[in-house]
Amino acid sequence: MKGIYSALLVSFDKDGNINEKGLREIIRHNIDVCKIDGLYVGGSTGENFMLSTDEKKRIFEIAMDEAKGQVKLIAQVGSVNLKEAVELAKFTTDLGYDAISAVTPFYYKFDFNEIKHYYETIINSVDNKLIIYSIPFLTGVNMSIEQFAELFENDKIIGVKFTAADFYLLERMRKAFPDKLIFAGFDEMMLPATVLGVDGAIGSTFNVNGVRARQIFEAAQKGDIETALEVQHVTNDLITDILNNGLYQTIKLILQEQGVDAGYCRQPMKEATEEMIAKAKEINKKYF
């Protein structure tokens, strides 16, 4: 399960419907061009929290059909609706996903006992492995190392997608849980996270920048910090340009420039303007 995973983008048509042909093209691009080790399906990058249960299921089906046996597949099934999370956990386990993942329950200020109940309910409903999806800056849920330890007492909870800039907590967790998987979740911080011993990374920009992500990861693991830092500098220049132009819209526009039918974003995300399209063309030419 270690390595470089793209947080899978989803192609939508102008009316917000899933563009199945485009989604398959994105998956193929990730596998054939970006050379990723796996796909993290149904996360923030997939605009998951704006989708119906049936739409989520269809995306899980397409990803499995297109990528089965070629790369590892992790299904993000988390939801504030626990019944939906359990339903999706069962659905993706039956499809054959290598692991499931679940974002910490958000919006309502759940206490830790409620969060623990949420995870135990999901993982105890299936014969599978679970990776916690920790992204405090969006969920408002900041778990302590003691709370992670309590969750990790369940052997079926095998790791965490750590999308935070708290490198002290990351170091403490790596030391405390040597047998648990830790995936870095911030693409722009991949080098320091790798130095601290993460087992891999899950990133949105890997949909276009997966090759550089692997270069950073492998160079840092070998102790070649100079090379890793050089590639991280280029990567962060790219990320800065993407963020300044609109994250998901720009990644999709870059893919369009590379011949992939990446489609539109789901409303209420805005449609790319002519200025955004022109800038994305410049970004693609500059970095790829």
Curated annotation (Swiss-Prot):
Binding residue positions for aceneuramate: 44-45, 163, 185, 187-188, 204
Pathway in which the depicted protein is active: Amino-sugar metabolism; N-acetylneuraminate degradation; D-fructose 6-phosphate from N-acetylneuraminate: step 1/5
EC number: 4.1.3.3
Biological processes annotated in GO: carbohydrate metabolic process; N-acetylneuraminate catabolic process
InterPro entries recorded: Aldolase_TIM (IPR013785), DapA-like (IPR002220), NanA (IPR005264), Schiff_base-form_aldolases_AS (IPR020625), Schiff_base-form_aldolases_CS (IPR020624)
Induction entry: By N-acetylneuraminate.
Enzyme class: lyase
Assigned GO CC terms: cytosol
Variant or mutagenesis effect after changing residue 133 to F/H/W/C: Large decrease in activity but increase in substrate affinity
CDD domains: NAL (cd00954)
Effect of residue 187 to E: 9-fold decrease in substrate affinity but almost no change in activity
Catalytic activity, reaction form: aceneuramate = aldehydo-N-acetyl-D-mannosamine + pyruvate
Substitution effect: residue 211 to I: In strain: NCTC 8798
Phenotypic consequence of residue 278 to E: In strain: NCTC 8798
Entry annotation: catalytic residues: 133 (proton donor), 161 (schiff-base intermediate with substrate)
SMART domains noted in UniProt: DHDPS
Any GO MF annotation of the entry: N-acetylneuraminate lyase activity
Temperature-activity note from the record: Optimum temperature is 65-70 degrees Celsius.
Keyword Cytoplasm set for record: yes
Keywords of this entry: Carbohydrate metabolism, Cytoplasm, Lyase, Schiff base
Activity across pH: Optimum pH is 7.6.
Outcome (variant: residue 187 to N): Large decrease in substrate affinity and activity
Function field: Catalyzes the reversible aldol cleavage of N-acetylneuraminic acid (sialic acid; Neu5Ac) to form pyruvate and N-acetylmannosamine (ManNAc) via a Schiff base intermediate.
Subunit architecture: Homotetramer.
Family to which the UniProt record says this protein belongs: Belongs to the DapA family. NanA subfamily.
Name this protein carries in UniProt: N-acetylneuraminate lyase
Classification of source organism: Bacteria, Bacillati, Bacillota, Clostridia, Eubacteriales
